[in-house]
Amino acid sequence: MAAVPPLRDRLSFLHRLPILLKGTSDDSIPCPGYLFEEIAKISHESLGSSQCLLEYLLNRLDSSSGHVKLKVLKILLYLCGHGSSSFLLILRRNSALIQEATAFSGPPDPLHGNSLYQKVRAAAQDLGSTLFSDAVPQPPSQPPQIPPPAGMGAQARPLSALQGFGYTKESSRTGSAGETFLSTIQRAAEVVANAVRPGPDNPCTKGPLPYGDSYQPAVTPSASHTHPNPGNLLPGAILGARAVRHQPGQAGGGWDELDSSPSSQNSSCTSNLSRASDSGSRSGSDSHSGTSREPGDLAERAEATPPNDCQQELNLVRTVTQGPRVFLSREETQHFIKECGLLNCEAVLELLLRQLVGTSECEQMRALCAIASFGSADLLPQEHVLLLCRQQLQELGAGSPGPVTNKATKILRHFEASCGQQLPTLRLCAQPNSAAAPVGPADLLTSPVPAPGSQVFLQPLSSATVVPRSPVLFPSPNTLPPSALEEPSEVRTQLVCSSEQGTESEQRLENTDTPEDSSSPLPWSPNSLFAGMELVACPRLPCHSSQDLQTDLQKVTTEAPVSEPSAFAFLNM
C-alpha cells in the first residue's frame, strides 16, 4: 500500500467488518448475493475505505483455506464491474496473491477430491483476465444513484411533481412547480366530472331519462334476471327492471330485493310474522304466502326453480332414459340420486312413470332402473313410492313376457316386501271348496298380531299328542300301511291323493285325539313355518280305543297315591 488510510476511515470500516466476516467465512456455504452489493458500497465511500477493504480482502486471500480463497476471488471479480476506480487501481498494483492463487493445490479431499482446488484456480484465472483486460469499461467514480421513491407525495429532486390520483407524467412539458400543481388539480377535476356527469357513452345512463327533479333510485343490471309476464310487456319494451320501493323502518334500509318474487314484498311488510313462523314452517317452501320465508330465500327459489316449471327434472329424466346401454351403470345411478336430492323427487318419479308408456324397450328398462334406485335412497318414503308406482308396475307386469315385464315385477315385489304389503301366495293344491274350511289361527312367526277372538296364550289341550289340521285333508294312520308311517315323503303322497276319505278320517281323529271339553279344535295355519311337521305321526297302540284311554285316565285319577318312605325320618311319622 502506498499510503496509510486515515484514522477516520479505519473507524468507519470497523462498522462494516461484520459484513465482510460473514461474506468470507470459512465454510462451504456460498456468499449471499446481497453481501456483494454491500461490499461494493464500501469501496465507493472514500479512498481510505477502498484501501481498508482491499487490505482486508488480500489478507483473507492469503489464507490456507480453499473456501475462503474461493469466496474472496468471487467478491473481487464482482468489484471489478461494480467497485470504485480507485479500488481497481490499487488492486492492479497488488495482484501478486491473485497470481499465486492460480497455482493453488493441496491434499485431495476424501469426498470431493481436487474439485475445490480446481474451482479456486479457475476463479483466479478469470479474475486476472478480467482485471487486466483492455475491454473493461471504466466504472463510474460515484456510486449508483438510488431510484426515486414511488407513490404519493413529491419526489426528492428539484422540479418534482405530485404523484397519485389524476397525475400523468409528461416528459415533453416543462414549467414551474406551481403550474404543474395547477394542471394536476385541473385534470383530476375533469376526471371526477366525467365520472359523475351523465353522457351518451356511459353504460349506466342508457335507461330512460328522469322526469323532473324527482328522485329515482339507480337500477342494477341484476334486475334482468326476473321473470316478467310476457302479456304485460309492450312490443317495443326492453326487459328492464322494475322500480325499487323504499319502506322506512325495515331491515336492510327498507329496500326490496330486485330479483325476488311478489311474495317477498308481503314478507317485508309482515317481517315479524315471518320471523315467528319461519322456524315452524320451513317445510312449506313451495307456498307463495311469503310469511314463512325471508325475501332472499324466496328470491333464490324463484330464480332457481320457478313455479309450475319442471324443466330441470325433465332434463334429468331425459338424460337418464337416453343412453346406449339397457341398464344404468353405478356412476349414472349415483349421479341420478345426487341430482334428485337437489330437485323435486316426486316430479322426477312422475316423469319416469310417464317414460314407461309409449317408449322403446331400452328407455323403459333405464327408467325402471332409475325407479329402482329410489328403493336404495332416502329421497322418498318407500310407501309413497309404492303408492305412485303400483298401478303402472302392475300394468307392465301383466303384459307380454319379456325383460320389461320381469323388471317391473321384480321392482314391485321389492317395494311390497320393503313396505310389508306382500300378499300371501295361495297353495295350488287347495280344494275348490277350501274357502268353507275353518281358517286356522295366525302363526306366531308370520302374523305378530293375533286374530280377533283367538286365544292369546298357548295352552295344551290334552296330555295326548295333538295332530293339527290343515286345509289339505289327510287320512288317519289306521288307513295307511305300516311302511307309510316310516317314510314321511310317502305319507305326503298318500295324503294329497286321498282327499275322498278325508272327512271320515277327520272324524276319527277328532274322536281319538280331541278331548271332550274342547268344542272348537284349533287347526294348523296354512302359512305356518312348521307346515309339514304334522306328517311325522306319533306311534300309537292299535289295540286301544278312545273309551279304553278314558277308562285308564279315570283309574289313574281315582286311585289313591301310594306314599313311599322318605329319606327324612320326621316326614315318615
UniProtKB/Swiss-Prot annotation:
Function according to Swiss-Prot or TrEMBL: Associates with the adapter-like complex 4 (AP-4) and may therefore play a role in vesicular trafficking of proteins at the trans-Golgi network.
Pfam family, one: ENTH
Annotated Pro residues bias: 137-150
Region (Disordered): 136-155, 194-311, 497-526
Encoding gene (name): Tepsin
Disulfide bonds: none
ENTH domain ranges (all copies): 8-141
Modified residues (Phosphoserine): S400
Self-association state and partner proteins as the record states: Interacts with AP4B1 and AP4E1; the interaction is direct and mediates the association of TEPSIN with the adapter-like complex 4 (AP-4), a heterotetramer composed of AP4B1, AP4E1, AP4M1 and AP4S1.
Bias type Basic and acidic residues, positions: 294-303
Subcellular localization, as worded in the UniProt entry: Golgi apparatus, trans-Golgi network membrane; Cytoplasmic vesicle; Cytoplasm, Cytosol
Record-given protein name: AP-4 complex accessory subunit Tepsin
Membrane topology: Peripheral membrane protein
Gene Ontology molecular function terms on file: protein-containing complex binding
Sequence ranges of Polar residues compositional bias: 217-229
